[in-house]
From Swiss-Prot:
Residues 62-80, 90-123, 620-629 have a biased composition (Polar residues). The gene is capu. This is Protein cappuccino. Belongs to the formin homology family. Cappuccino subfamily. One of its GO terms (biological process) is oogenesis. Residues 133-142, 483-541 have a biased composition (Pro residues). Residues 480-560 form the FH1 domain. Acts as an actin nucleation factor and promotes assembly of actin filaments together with spir. May play a role in intracellular vesicle transport along actin fibers, providing a novel link between actin cytoskeleton dynamics and intracellular transport. Keywords: Actin-binding, Cytoplasm, Cytoplasmic vesicle, Cytoskeleton, Developmental protein, Membrane, Protein transport, Stress response, Transport. Residues 585-1032 form the FH2 domain. SMART domains: FH2. PANTHER family: FORMIN HOMOLOGY 2 DOMAIN CONTAINING, ISOFORM I (PTHR45920), FORMIN-G (PTHR45920:SF7).
Amino acid sequence: MALQLGKKLAQVLGSGAGSPLTPGTMEPCAAGSGSPLANGELFNVSKAKKVELQNLSSRFTAAVTQTPPGVTSSTPNESGVTGPAGPLGATTSSPSLETQSTVIISFKSSQTPVQSQTNSAASENVEDDTAPLPLPPPPPGFGTPTTPLLSSNVLKKVASFTVEKSSAGNNSSNPPNLCPTSDETTLLATPCSSSLTVATLPPEIAVGAAAGGVAGGAGSRRGSSYVPEKLSFAAYEKFEGQMLIKWLISTMQSNPKSSSGDANQELFNTLALQFCNNLKYVGVLKQISNEHLDCGFSPYEMYQWTHTEQPTTSLPLTPGKLDKVAAWPFSSTPSGIRALESASLASLGAGGVAGSLATIATASTASSDNQKTLQQILKKRLLNCTTLAEVHAVVNELLSSVDEPPRRPSKRCVNLTELLNASEATVYEYNKTGAEGCVKSFTDAETQTESEDCEGTCKCGQSSTKVSDNESAKEDGEKPHAVAPPPPPPPPPLHAFVAPPPPPPPPPPPPPPLANYGAPPPPPPPPPGSGSAPPPPPPAPIEGGGGIPPPPPPMSASPSKTTISPAPLPDPAEGNWFHRTNTMRKSAVNPPKPMRPLYWTRIVTSAPPAPRPPSVANSTDSTENSGSSPDEPPAANGADAPPTAPPATKEIWTEIEETPLDNIDEFTELFSRQAIAPVSKPKELKVKRAKSIKVLDPERSRNVGIIWRSLHVPSSEIEHAIYHIDTSVVSLEALQHMSNIQATEDELQRIKEAAGGDIPLDHPEQFLLDISLISMASERISCIVFQAEFEESVTLLFRKLETVSQLSQQLIESEDLKLVFSIILTLGNYMNGGNRQRGQADGFNLDILGKLKDVKSKESHTTLLHFIVRTYIAQRRKEGVHPLEIRLPIPEPADVERAAQMDFEEVQQQIFDLNKKFLGCKRTTAKVLAASRPEIMEPFKSKMEEFVEGADKSMAKLHQSLDECRDLFLETMRFYHFSPKACTLTLAQCTPDQFFEYWTNFTNDFKDIWKKEITSLLNELMKKSKQAQIESRRNVSTKVEKSGRISLKERMLMRRSKN
């Protein structure tokens, strides 16, 4: 049964990447004491060792024997199995089991072998195969080992099972009771494991299980071949643990030789659970969640088959160290071919075409022999490799020693050779006359060389032009001597890339041009006595004729069939090497005086072309012909000649010249610019201030200095403002501040003592000293300040009294207000009709005024106050008053609120305080006049006498206004039959806020509703007027249609109505 579980595991994991199961033969053997089954090292995926299927099954069986207690107690042969006689009894199994095949399963992994993850205690304990196997905690990282992975494509990073046959000869040579040893420490399963499995089963299924083991080993593998999609190893799916257990149990139950029963079902469950637990331990299964990783297999967790990931081969973001292969300049031509090219060039230069062909054939044969020798050495090294790591090292060494293939040129940049339309891949030359008849020779078409002129120009890498042998053969059918390049020899050393150029051979006679190329252009004249080709890389061309030109170097005289030779640079005298600026035809004019500018737009005509020297003309003609392509014939002298330059346009500025004038001096005087000499301001010498004496403390000095700097006036003007009571120069606020900061007697004494010395006082001390010198300064300032305060206080008190007086008078005498109250009385009696307590009223108390808005009608937006306002407006409309002329019948809400805030007792106290201050000011004025000298007495005396006279009248008027306002307020309360809430108070004791509190809300609500009603009435009248106009226009149009005659006025009205 355990064997069957192992086969199912091979089937599941083999579905992803593995070989099919193949039967084999085996020899019986007993498991030694050194078996690694105890610590599970043999079955770890990261160890990459081979495991026999029987060994795997015996491990599962041994683990099951100690798991289910119910089954163990019912097994009578348990003591024999677990005792010392277990191995002896195992050797006496049925001889039919000896024919059972031994299947070796190996965990294939791409990882390098790691060190053993088991502890030393586990390796010292010697256990029997049949002893209970406890499950140690899984070693750290057994599912995802951290060993560095190889980056070769030869190794595959998958965990799979590979089934192999064990050799029958090796197994038969071992004694029956001894375990064979192999290089890979493979343990062969013996019939002992099968007998142990039978011994652990219940008696009723022991025979069937033994027979099933024989049949399963010798015959064909039975069982269901169906694997669920999520359990497939190649599907990379996540599945629940119970799904795997159910599938394993179903495969065991599907076996026709397995008996059914409750005990058997429990054994199946235990065996499948232990089987999955071992799979998790060895690393085949990987738990997804990180919780309970140290526990065993759980059917309620999510699992996944362990797959090792493919190593990433992403290139580094920053360039690393360049190796020899990527050394600059890059060349994809093997050194063997370069040697052949050099040999062919030398032979062509010395002995002609025939000698070069013989040299190329000899070199090609030597290169082929060298390549075969290298291939034989490589085969021997590969055969001597015993592990995949060694094979991988050999392959890497081979790959690193071979040049990389030619890179594809980038589309974003072009080589300089392509821009110049020249290359060294194919070397040939046209004769200018075409008279000689020689066969044109080509170099090897597949020789890829670097363009020397492209170095440092194209940054995306060097590229070469690759031409196949077939294309070369089509282009030149007369080349029987062209030899194909031999296979590439081993990579040359680094010094081969920078070999010195060979000595140039004498140039051969130029061959005639091919028929399909037309007339070739004449080549540029080479320097005398020069060689034939630039130094390699690339190698020198076969044909001569071109020399090494001086810098800037032109291209070789033998361009490719798809390029042309570049023209040499023009003569520097022509100005084509550098951009020639447009020079002026006229010389600069320097007037004797600076003139006024004339802002015009200058036109500069080009200078006439200078005649060209004959030598320059000849060289230019030769360069023009040399720049053509070898595929194109030279331009003819007739119709193919380039068109001449168009004649210059005729302009007035090229025909006229400046006229000499006789009155240029007069012009200079008239239009010269007058230069104004800058006048420098005289520098004011700042007198450094001497040290000053500070008497005050720093805080006091700072406060006095702030007030002094805010005045911005000298002390003399301050003195004048105080003597003349002039607040236009010094503000009243500044005078108040000066009155507050006056020096005390102590400070003033210290300041006077410091002022007698040579060192001046500081500004704050000097300011206090100047104020103290003013006669009666503080008394004068107090009188001036009180004069301003008195006028302000009297004005405020008069306004309060006038507000209450005017409001009381309006409430008594307003006819509009009386109409409103009559409407309220009428509607109230109508609403209270039939009620003996509230009906038939002659008046109402003022507390109802604030409740009118709360009386709702059937319409939610209409209240009793709304109806009262509409009724008042309708009454005024009946009298013929226009809606815009209807006045608000009630007092202004703002006046009512101000009147409610006034208190007669408070006003009377304010008048009393003001009168007291006024009396003090009188005494101060008399004191100042008594202490002042006659010259400083005026105008202070006259102004203060005038103020005192006016203040006496104002105080008497205030007392009178207060009494009149109080009497009028009492009359108003009696007029409206007002009674205070507190019955103990009389009308004389009532305050304005108690009376006007009923009017405040009423006036605010009445005014808001009155504004809305007036606006609504005006809109309604506007609609009616527009409707009337429309009706009148319609009537006019009907009358015109009836009469048949339309006047001009009627036409205008019709047009307006239509618009």
